[in-house]
């Protein structure tokens, strides 16, 4: 009986999970797709993601996450990239400051450009 009660409680609690609220108006999402020169190379991917982690300290960033492509047969899905980066900024001014921040330009010049053959950026705001 205790096991049954525990399972029911676990089920009820898991159904109470909520998703995060929408980002505040004025925030900017900076989505960057990377195609590695050596597709799938784990050592290069680690260097790239380490560079991304070093960007977290730049003022104006409210969130930073990255990952790899999810394979898909759907024709509308582009899964040809190796790594995607998502950076959320508090506003457009923070995005523009980031673009010229020496820490960002250093990682781009020393790590990202040497290890990637293509970079595609999408920025959007609310």
Question: Which residue ranges define each predicted feature?
Answer:
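Positively charged n-region of N-terminal signal peptides that target proteins for export
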Residues: 1-4
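Bacterial N-terminal signal peptides
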Residues: 6-15
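Short S/T/G/P-rich N-terminal loop/turn motif that feeds into the first structured element of a domain
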Residues: 16-82, 86, 90-96, 124-126
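Histidine-centered active-site/metal-ligand motif
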Residues: 30, 101-104
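Extracytoplasmic/secreted proteins, especially bacterial periplasmic and envelope-associated proteins
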Residues: 43, 47-50, 103, 107, ...
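A generic structural signal for alpha->beta connector loops
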Residues: 61, 116-118
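Short, exposed beta-strand-loop hairpins at the edges of beta-sheets
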Residues: 96-99, 109-116
């Amino acid at each position: 009986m205790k096991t049954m009660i525990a399972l029911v409680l676990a089920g009820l609690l898991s159904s109470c999970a909520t998703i995060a609220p929408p980002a505040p108006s004025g925030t900017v999402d900076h989505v960057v797709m990377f195609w590695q020169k050596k597709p799938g190379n784990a050592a290069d991917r680690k260097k790239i993601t380490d560079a991304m982690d070093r960007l977290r300290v730049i003022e104006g960033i409210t969130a930073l996450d990255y990952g790899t492509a999810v394979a898909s047969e759907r024709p509308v899905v582009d899964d040809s990239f190796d790594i995607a980066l998502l950076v959320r900024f508090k506003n457009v001014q923070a995005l523009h400051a980031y673009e010229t921040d020496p820490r960002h330009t250093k990682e781009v010049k020393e790590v990202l450009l040497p290890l990637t053959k293509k970079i595609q950026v999408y920025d959007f705001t609310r």
